[in-house]
Amino acid sequence: MKHLFLTTSVLATCLASATQAGVIEERKAKFKENVAILRAIQTQIGKGDFEAIAAGGRSIADWAIKMPDFFPEGSESAGALDAIWIDFDDFQSKAVANKEAALQLEQAARTKDAGQIMAAVQKLSGTCKSCHRSFKSN
């Protein structure tokens, strides 16, 4: 019985570790995707591809809604400061601000007004920078 408990404990630890690694890799991939979307939007503004801009805003908003779930305790990694888990409420509020700014970008794209779109992109980028200043190490 003692060996069964020990084996079960070791397996649970390994599974948790593998799960954390998966969460870390997935969140890194989503952040890279956001960067790619924002870069693409710069090109799409010049082309007048408003549907693509709106879709990009929606995609970023969808990630922002899920983002806090990808930072469970124990998923510390290079680049993520401990401040995320120390002040998780602030981290969550910054994710909400990111979501709201992304939805504003989506709405601005529907107006087809480049000025509104650029203002929305700047606001969205500001929410990214705000979070990075507080919670990203590099």
Name what the model sees in each region.
Residues 15, 122-125:
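Processing junctions and N-termini across compartments
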Residues 21-123:
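Extracytoplasmic c-type cytochrome modules immediately beyond a signal peptide or single-pass transmembrane anchor
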Residues 1-7:
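Bacterial N-terminal signal peptides that target proteins for export
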Residues 7-14:
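Bacterial N-terminal signal peptides
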Residues 15-21:
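Sec/Tat signal peptide C-region and signal peptidase I cleavage site
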Residues 124-136:
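The canonical Cys-X-X-Cys-His
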